[in-house]
Amino acid sequence: EQTGDWKRVRHNYLETLTQMFVDRWAKPMSAYCDRKGMLWTGHYWEHDWPSMYQGGDNMAMYAWHQMPAIDMLFNQYNDQSPQAQFGNVRAVKELRSAANQTGSVRTLSETYGGGGWDETFRDFKRLGDWEYALGVNFMNQHLSHMTIVGARKYDYPPVFTRLSPWWEDYKVLNDYFARLSLVLSQGEQMNDILVLEPTTTIWLYYSYVMNDPRCMEIGSAFQRFVTTLEKAQAEYDLGSENIIKDRGSVRGGKFVVGKRAYAKVVIPPMTENLNAGTFSLIRQFVEAGGQLVLFAQPTLVDGRPSPELADFLDRNASRIRRYTALDGKAIAESFADDRIRFCNVRGNDLYHQRRTYEDGELLFLVNSSLSDTATGSVGLPAGELVELDAVTGDMRPYPHTADGKSVGADFSLPPAGSLLLFAPASGRSALARTSRAASGTERPTAGSVKLEPAGPLEVTRLKDNVLNLDFCDLTVDGRTERNLYTFEACNKLFNHCYGTGNPWDSAIQYR
């Protein structure tokens, strides 16, 4: 019930559960893998966030993996729901941010599960590009059945074995993601902005027995917030208060979380609570000249009203930026970065990742739309641009303008298209000198290459086609039900004969 000191009680309860999960499971297993020279991986996030019943803080758990990981199911792009899979910006940004802060080189995704038998190479590329742009750099394809007899046919296909007709051609796509995995695990993603997750505020409203609708309202508001930032090409990391507790400090006017130091800290909409350790560091950060950006004014510390927090925010009002909405003005004032500039962007599904190498900057652009082209221009501090073709492994100069300090380039990405660029720090790069294309030549883009036929095309049927029956009539003990979906009919039959559902569904049979 929401009575008495209920916010503090819920906060402390979920904080205790989360910390016990870390202390009694994540830390010992991480230490064991360190001793044995193994990389521990796996995914914690499920598909019900901001519900907390499967864990109190996803990012807190990632911090103890040698290779933090997520899964990414299905093939329906949804960039709105906090419980979506493909399209869920927050889920992948949590992974990438934790890896940045802990120094994990590789981030894994179990990808494509449940996408269906009809997924195409274009679908595979589109989903993979999207999650790689947001922070994944190692892929584990789901799934590789040894057999598809019976109910296995609908056990979360596609199937990555010779049982799929495209298997012999899949190497092309695998090589593509292998090259992306290499370049996106080199260098560092160095973001200057830390956006706190409202996890400890959600704790106040989450209940195992009677969830408050405000829980989903906070989660949805945060989902919109990070998705808007991502589509505005802002560069930022997300912050877990549990990770901040263990790895946070203030040094040189920066808010430090592990291996990352941030010049700005952002408190997102609907945030009510800060943990005591987080508040202490924010206070030190602002007093040291750091920039605090508020889209909400928290009033609680550890679930209790805090006059000290209110006084701090009032006394430092002139040093704190406050916004009521994440609009164009807020993005331009508080999220712009001189290290990369986007102009005249058209297309609502453009994503990017920029990584800093010792000798330059790497930029990966993807267009996740299946219908619209994404166009615009981008500027980077460099002397030239080189395109890295992740399909062929080729390197070639990319058309650009230069003023001695920076380069500017136009891009046009077709639906499900991508572009990988490298901007050398200074001088002319060895990549450009050894490239196969001449500088300034017109660059064909994916989807724009015309293939001429080598001769007449003839298609021959090798064997009779299979006619799939999705609906059927079922007769059991003289009683007939008509037009049932075959999956439902199977369950009814198994229930009648054995008193249980289909034992072949989501189960293992050895005979």
Question: Each predicted region: which residue ranges?
Answer:
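Carbohydrate-binding surfaces of carbohydrate-active enzymes
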Residues: 1-511
